[in-house]
């Protein structure tokens, strides 16, 4: 299989072909996802909750991300691999570049950062140094203490700010954007306005791609289950069939449905 590239995702957007992505944290699942046709994977700081058992993503370190990135890369050598820069890993441009280098050397093709227009200079600095960047707007889990919990973002007056943040990130050189827990109407406005691919999670079926935390997709998340999550394993019966069903429902626009969306 040829390596999956950012250019391929750009082509998907231009041709209006939806694509499925998912989080991965180890060799075995990365290989399974790649074998079944998910060719874009994220080593997310969500591992702090799903793998390490913390109540937020905040304790995750750059070293944690690098460790799991190496494992995922071994399992999916041709996948486009995104890696989160975790909490406080990009407080200054110098720190950001050093930490981005760590996860890129571990096997990432792109780093993902949470934040809006205030990150533009950092995104521009990375892009100028050949580090591809994926932005992340809406519900940004590293800011959970500021938001007062895991809540829908971008409603009311905040919608225009978030829209302008998206434009600023693209202008600064971001090549992908994740939108999390925002109203469908805002997600469509942003997706239509940007030339770069937009990946949604809790943003309706109007984005170019979708992403799920793998534990949510298989119904093994403990405690609160997000509204946007769907247990594909319950319907499919086995993990490989669940992955194929997830891909098919994303590509056809069946998932996410109205019951998984916000307004």
Swiss-Prot record:
Annotated positions binding 3-methyl-2-oxobutanoate: 45-46, 84, 112
List its EC numbers.
2.1.2.11
What is the enzyme's main class?
Answer: transferase
Cofactor binding note: Binds 1 Mg(2+) ion per subunit.
A single GO molecular-function term is:
3-methyl-2-oxobutanoate hydroxymethyltransferase activity
Could you say which cofactors this protein requires? Mg(2+)
Reactions that this protein is recorded to catalyse: 3-methyl-2-oxobutanoate + (6R)-5,10-methylene-5,6,7,8-tetrahydrofolate + H2O = 2-dehydropantoate + (6S)-5,6,7,8-tetrahydrofolate
Q: Does the keyword Metal-binding apply?
A: yes
The protein's name in its UniProt record = 3-methyl-2-oxobutanoate hydroxymethyltransferase
Give the originating organism: Klebsiella pneumoniae subsp. pneumoniae (strain ATCC 700721 / MGH 78578)
């Amino acid at each position: 299989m040829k390596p999956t590239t950012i250019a391929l995702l750009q082509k998907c957007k231009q041709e209006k072909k939806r694509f499925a992505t998912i989080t991965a944290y180890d060799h075995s699942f990365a290989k399974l996802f790649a074998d079944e046709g998910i060719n874009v994977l994220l080593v997310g700081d969500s591992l702090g909750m799903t793998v390490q058992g913390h109540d937020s993503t905040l304790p995750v370190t750059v070293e944690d991300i690098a460790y799991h990135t190496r494992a995922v890369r071994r399992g999916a050598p041709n996948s486009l691999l995104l890696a989160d820069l975790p909490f406080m890993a990009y407080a200054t441009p110098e720190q950001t570049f050093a930490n981005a280098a760590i996860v890129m050397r571990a096997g990432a093709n792109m780093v993902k950062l949470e934040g809006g227009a205030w990150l533009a200079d950092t995104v521009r600095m990375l892009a100028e140094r050949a580090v591809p960047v994926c932005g992340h707007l809406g519900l940004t889990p590293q800011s959970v203490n500021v938001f007062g919990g895991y809540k829908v973002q971008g409603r009311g007056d905040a919608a225009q700010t978030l829209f302008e943040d998206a434009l600023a990130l693209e202008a600064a050189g971001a090549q992908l954007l994740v939108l999390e827990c925002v109203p469908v109407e805002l997600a469509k406005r942003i997706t239509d306005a940007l030339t770069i691919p937009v990946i949604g999670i809790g943003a309706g079926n109007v984005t170019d791609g979708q992403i799920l935390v793998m534990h949510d997709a298989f119904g093994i998340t403990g405690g609160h289950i997000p509204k946007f999550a769907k247990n594909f394993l319950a319907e499919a019966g086995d993990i490989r069939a669940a992955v194929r069903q997830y891909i098919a429902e994303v590509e056809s626009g069946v998932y996410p449905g109205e019951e998984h969306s916000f307004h």
